[in-house]
């Protein structure tokens, strides 16, 4: 009898161990009872502003990406630091935009449901909604993320793929987050609505080898155009260039066509053609429909949105997205 009781207790504790994490997972409509209008508030706010800010979708999806790649999707990219060592102070995040936009959404939500909706969930929802309102793909965003307490510039520098990445570096950094080469190609497709400062790629135009010279992987005609019309010097850090010229406002397949023509703006774009798996994925996407691409892109976004999420007591809900709870 004692043996049976011991076994029963063991099973009971085992089940508690299983049920706990399951209950802590993300779920659709997480705020249905605690803040029923949360997702509509985010959606309406995005809808009211995206028409006046066509680059908003690209800015928010980039913020979501940069947030998830450092300590998971926990809103830590939003935290300000008086000492200048938070994630947003790291070089990859100096050109990230949308912080004020997320703060504004948070203020509306706090007025409706104080201390309920996390900043991490706001980023995930707003980035999806902004892309949808520009005619891009839709994807499921389960909620229940908690916000992180730590934001470290060095970690951002170590984990966010720079635009100078080769395929080996990209594969490693994506694998570190549980993403594969297919995800890399699909998520890179967001560059179709992206923009970049000249400083992110002028080394390809003026000093690729460190002793001057141009990146041979970049189409020479395209490079000449960039030099003469967009980025006249190596040190231009103000001019903004479309990553998918002429099609930036349309979420489509043209980015991949440019990559195959050696007209991807970043080295990391060109790198996608240097690996048989990534190249095969590009060709497969281009022979398929836009609808198929949207469906696959959605799956990779859903996968990215679950990276190392904090739920339950593992995180907090910040009252101000830019300030870590004391």
UniProtKB/Swiss-Prot annotation:
Site (Transition state stabilizer): 62
Residue numbers binding Ca(2+) 2: 192, 244, 247, 252
Enzyme Commission code: 1.11.1.7
Active-site annotation: 66
Enzyme class of the recorded protein, top EC level: oxidoreductase
Reactions mediated catalytically: 2 a phenolic donor + H2O2 = 2 a phenolic radical donor + 2 H2O
Disulfide links within the chain: 35-113, 68-73, 119-321, 198-231
Pfam families in the record: peroxidase (PF00141)
BP GO terms, sorted: hydrogen peroxide catabolic process; hyperosmotic salinity response; response to cold; response to desiccation; response to oxidative stress
Cofactor: heme b; Ca(2+)
UniProt GO MF annotations: heme binding; lactoperoxidase activity; metal ion binding; peroxidase activity
Protein name: Peroxidase 3
Species this chain originates from: Arabidopsis thaliana
Gene designation: PER3
């Amino acid at each position: 009898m004692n043996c049976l009781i011991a076994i029963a207790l063991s099973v009971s504790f085992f089940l508690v161990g299983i049920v706990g994490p399951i209950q802590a997972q993300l779920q659709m409509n997480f705020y249905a009872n605690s803040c029923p209008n949360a997702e509509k508030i985010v959606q309406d706010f995005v809808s009211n502003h995206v028409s006046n800010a066509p680059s908003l979708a690209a800015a928010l999806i980039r913020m979501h990406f940069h947030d998830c790649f450092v300590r998971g999707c926990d809103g830590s990219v939003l935290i300000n630091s008086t000492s200048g060592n938070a994630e947003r102070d790291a070089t990859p995040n100096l050109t990230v935009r949308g912080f004020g936009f997320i703060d504004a959404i948070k203020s509306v939500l706090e007025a409706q449901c104080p201390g309920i909706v996390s900043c991490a969930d706001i980023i995930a929802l707003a980035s999806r909604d902004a892309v949808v309102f520009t005619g891009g793909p839709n994807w499921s965003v389960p909620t229940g993320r908690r916000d992180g307490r730590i934001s470290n510039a060095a970690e951002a520098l170590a984990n966010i793929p720079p635009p100078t990445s080769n395929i080996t570096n990209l594969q490693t950094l994506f694998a570190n987050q549980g993403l594969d080469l297919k995800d890399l190609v699909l998520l890179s497709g967001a560059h179709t609505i992206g923009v970049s400062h000249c400083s992110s790629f002028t080394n390809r135009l003026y000093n690729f080898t460190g002793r001057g010279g141009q990146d041979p992987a970049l189409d020479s005609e395209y490079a000449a155009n960039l030099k003469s019309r967009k980025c006249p010097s190596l040190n231009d850090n103000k001019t903004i260039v479309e990553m998918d010229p002429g099609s930036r406002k349309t979420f489509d397949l043209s980015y991949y066509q440019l990559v195959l023509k050696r007209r991807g703006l970043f080295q990391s774009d060109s790198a996608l053609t240097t690996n048989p798996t990534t190249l095969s994925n590009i060709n497969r996407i281009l022979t398929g429909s836009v609808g198929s691409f949207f469906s696959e892109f959605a799956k990779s976004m859903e996968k990215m949105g679950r990276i190392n999420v904090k739920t339950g007591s593992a995180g907090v809900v910040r009252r101000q997205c830019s300030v870590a709870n004391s």
